[in-house]
Amino acid sequence: MKPRIKVVTLGVSDLERSLIFYRDGLGLPTQGIIGTEFEEGAVVFFNMNDDLILALYPGHALDKDAKVPVSPPSPSDLSIGHIVGSKEEVDAIMQQAEIAGARVTDPARDRFWGGYSGYFQDLDGHLWEIAWNPAWEVKE
C-alpha cells in the first residue's frame, strides 16, 4: 500500500476562534466554515499544498465521530512541522503566530541537526514546529 495522507484534522474547542487564528493570524487561505447544514458537520479546510489539507473540526464532534472518549489534548503526542526556505522565514512565521495568540514554547534557534526551528502552540495547544533544514529543498 502506498500511503496517501491527504488530510490532517485538528480537534478544536471553538471553531470560529480557530478559524480567525489560522486565517487572519497566520494567513492561511480558506473558504471559511462549511458544512453547517449538517448536524455536527461544521468544518474548516485549508489547502496547504497540492497534497495536503489542514482541517479544523470541533473536538467534541471529532470524538463522537471517531467513537472515542472525550479527553484533554496532550501537546506532546504530535507536532506539525511546517518547513520553510530560510531562517528569516522561520522567524517571521514565529512572530506572526505569537501576534495571532500562539504560545511560543521554544523560540527559533539553531538546532543540533544543523537546521533552525522554533515551536509554538495554537489556541487549543496543538504543537507546531516551524523549521528550516539546509538539507531539504523547499518547492514553492
Regions found by a protein language model. Give the residues of each.
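N-terminal beta-strand motif that seeds the catalytic metal site of vicinal oxygen chelate
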Residues: 1-19, 37-39, 77-82, 134-140
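Acetyl-CoA-dependent GNAT
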Residues: 57-64, 133-135
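Core segments of cupin and vicinal oxygen chelate
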Residues: 9-61
